[in-house]
């Protein structure tokens, strides 16, 4: 546990020490990694792991993130995937000065089952959020109206809010029935209302599977909330990861417009991974977008569920 001891000692420059750890899918090791913990994001000061070397464990290759599709560039792909999986550097609700309340980050999530293991004694069953819950201090801080007086703010690494990506302010909360909800706040107040209206209309249309949103009040703000659709046996794979994991064919590359290329390659990627009903889902989603006048459709705000 050399890294843990080093990371916990205050006053030392722990960020320069090479550490060795394993990317896990539940209790399956999928990649051996070496690298450093760095404050790698431009605007927010979130320590993240950046790999210098990544080695795929062949016997568990099928459990890798879909995004990591090539052994030749596995280190580059891991770092890109990892950066997409955590807080966006465009988030405006992240405190400028932080006092971390726990030892080191495993980067568990409520949308997949990947995590960083530092020691072979660490077990998925003891640490994952689905079974063990999580502290709410990190999410409380993101939504507080008093960030300027939090100097420093106290946050936990071991929180699903650290791996809630995207630009909107968001947090996870678990109710008394142990059901997890994602709560989102928008800067202009319009987005959360749009999500609730879209839920009403899509329910009436009944043509495509969708995530239902409702309104709630969180820390004096009108927010939208949705139930977690990922379970202990599934993970969410963004369409962008499926899209980027398949090489472009010459035929698609020669299409005239970018929307044509994007659509054609996405459908080709869905067929490559043999996603049941995937192409039909995309077509119906695009029809619903036209009805809703949704011009914000992109490959990171929809996706597919994978059994794990």
Q: Predicted regions span which residues?
A:
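Phosphate/dinucleotide-binding and metal-coordinating scaffold of catalytic cores
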Residues: 2-287, 291-293, 303-308
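Canonical protein kinase catalytic loop motif
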Residues: 298
